[in-house]
Amino acid sequence: MMTRNTDAASMRAGFGFPQSLLRLGRFFPLLLLVLIFAACAPKKKSQGATSSPSLTIGAMSSMDFLPFAVAQETGIYDSLGLKLEIVHFFSANDRDAALQAGKLDGTVTDYTGAALQVAGGLDAGLVMKLDGDFSWMAYGATSEAFPSSFGVSSNTVVDFLTDRFTQPAVAKGAVVHRVEVQKIPLRLELLLQGKIGSAVLPEPFATMAEASGRCGRRDVSSAHHWEATGLLVKRELAQDGNNKALALLLQGYNLAVIKLRDADTKTLARWIKDYAGAPEKLAAHIPVPDYTPATPPKAEELQAAIAWLKQKKALKKDLTPQQLIVPMPALP
């Protein structure tokens, strides 16, 4: 008579569990690991709903971009929820190349530069004008004679303003002799040495020339209410439904304008030194523009720049002021 081993039988029977469940149990540790990793994995976020909008803009040291820098330094953009990166350039060519390569969302530039970029195929436009002064400086602090030469950078705002400043004299027969000097610091140095007779300079370089005692200020662009610079942005950033970041950028600019108006002399001088490149001893003496809230460019000022470039045969195609402007988003 064969005796049945009940322990072995129980194991073979799985204590009453079906064999299929026992086979599944072999994979339970692996299944548990998968569930643990799934629970620990970072959840994907909706880009539009939860991520902060961000922008990267280019600028050169100047007075016109100062409100953007102040808004960034004082935490205005952080409080608005905008991640802003300002990339500083020492060359307009490098700045423009970065914009064309898609490394920037926008840049502070002049109207002539914006027209050349758009005519060259860049899908961008000016969303606002900026406040910065240019001065006609001449060697010889007290001389009233028409300068023998002008340091310029061809087809730039300096070249354009040279013609605007000298137009009355040219109408009476004066001749503007141009000397190509692309970099502003070199232009200032040559002017201080008397190697060029005149130059149009932005701040703080104009005040630096005047403070030397060797140069006089003949005229300033603000006296004529001329616009010269603005914020050029990719056109897609100004489209309805996609302009939140741009709206925050301009909102922060407006709040910084208030801060600049209310700032004490010491704070204002530090900002001008840090962001406009003024020497520390002169920073408190740099004329501060009458900064205004974000305002679209004037069509007539854009038309003046376009007409001048056409006369110089510098544009690859015809442009209208409307083709140079993108709509400004609604601001609080």
Regions inferred by a protein language model and the residue ranges of each:
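Short, glycine-/small- and polar/acidic-enriched structural segments
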Residues: 47-181, 190, 197-203, 217-219, ...
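Conserved C-terminal helix/tail region of periplasmic/extracytoplasmic solute-binding proteins
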Residues: 310-332
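Secondary-structure end/capping motifs
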Residues: 239-316
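Bacterial N-terminal signal peptides that target proteins for export
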Residues: 4-28
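C-terminal motif of bacterial Sec signal peptides marking the signal peptidase cleavage site
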Residues: 36-39
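Sec-dependent N-terminal signal peptides
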Residues: 30-34
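Bacterial signal peptide processing site
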Residues: 41-43
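Pocket-lining segment of extracytoplasmic ligand-binding domains
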Residues: 112, 183-272
